[in-house]
Swiss-Prot record:
SUPFAM superfamilies: Ribosomal protein L14. Its main location: cytoplasm. This is Large ribosomal subunit protein uL14A. Component of the ribosome, a large ribonucleoprotein complex responsible for the synthesis of proteins in the cell. The small ribosomal subunit (SSU) binds messenger RNAs (mRNAs) and translates the encoded message by selecting cognate aminoacyl-transfer RNA (tRNA) molecules. The large subunit (LSU) contains the ribosomal catalytic site termed the peptidyl transferase center (PTC), which catalyzes the formation of peptide bonds, thereby polymerizing the amino acids delivered by tRNAs into a polypeptide chain. It comes from Schizosaccharomyces pombe (strain 972 / ATCC 24843) (Fission yeast). CDD domains: Ribosomal_uL14. Keywords: Cytoplasm, Nucleus, Ribonucleoprotein, Ribosomal protein. PANTHER family: 50S/60S RIBOSOMAL PROTEIN L14/L23, LARGE RIBOSOMAL SUBUNIT PROTEIN UL14. Belongs to the universal ribosomal protein uL14 family. InterPro entries: Ribosomal_uL14, Ribosomal_uL14_CS, Ribosomal_uL14_sf. One of its GO terms (cellular component) is nucleus. Pfam families: Ribosomal_L14. GO terms for molecular function: large ribosomal subunit rRNA binding; structural constituent of ribosome. Component of the large ribosomal subunit (LSU). Mature yeast ribosomes consist of a small (40S) and a large (60S) subunit. The 40S small subunit contains 1 molecule of ribosomal RNA (18S rRNA) and at least 33 different proteins. The large 60S subunit contains 3 rRNA molecules (25S, 5.8S and 5S rRNA) and at least 46 different proteins.
Length: 139
C-alpha cells in the first residue's frame, strides 16, 4: 500500500504512476522555479529495465531547468501535486489534471515557497500537511 517517504503522515493507496524519471513538470509554487526535471523517486524498488515513476503525493529528487539562477543546477526534493495520467480512486472516480506539477520542499516536507498555484490532488494534501495548508483548492 504505502511506499517509503520522509515526513508524510498516513498511508497512500496505489495510484497509476504518471511521471517516470526524466519527466519535466511545472513548478506550482512561488519559489522562483518554472519547471522541475525528475531525477529519482523516493521509495521505489528496482526491476530490470523499469524506470522509477512517481504519482501525486510522491516525493522525488528534482532539478530546476528554468527559473532563478540560484535554484538551478542543484538537486532538491520536490512533491508531485498534479499529474496528467488518469488514476482511479477507491470510490470509482477516475481523475486527471491538465498538467504535471510539483512543489519544491525540504527533506522534512516543508515548502520552499509560500503559495501553490492551481489545484492539488487530495492524495497529496492528505499526506503532506504543509502542502494542504498552502493549497488554494484540493480536488
Amino acid at each position: 500500500m504505502s511506499r517509503g517517504r520522509g515526513a508524510a503522515s498516513g498511508t497512500k493507496y496505489r495510484m497509476t504512476l504518471g511521471l517516470p524519471v526524466q519527466a519535466i513538470m511545472n513548478c506550482a509554487d512561488n519559489s522562483g522555479a518554472k519547471n522541475l526535471y525528475i531525477v529519482s523517486v523516493f521509495g521505489t524498488g528496482a526491476r530490470l529495465n523499469r524506470l522509477p515513476a512517481a504519482s501525486c503525493g510522491d516525493m522525488v529528487l528534482a532539478t530546476v531547468k528554468k527559473g532563478k539562477p540560484d535554484l538551478r543546477k542543484k538537486i532538491m526534493p520536490a512533491i508531485v501535486v498534479r499529474q496528467r495520467k488518469a488514476w482511479r480512486r477507491k470510490d470509482g472516480v477516475y481523475l486527471y489534471f491538465e498538467d504535471n506539477a510539483g512543489v519544491i520542499v525540504n527533506p522534512k516536507g516543508e515548502m520552499k515557497g509560500s503559495a501553490i498555484t492551481g489545484p492539488v490532488a487530495k492524495e497529496c494534501a492528505d499526506l503532506w500537511p504543509r502542502i494542504a495548508s498552502n493549497a488554494g483548492t484540493v480536488v
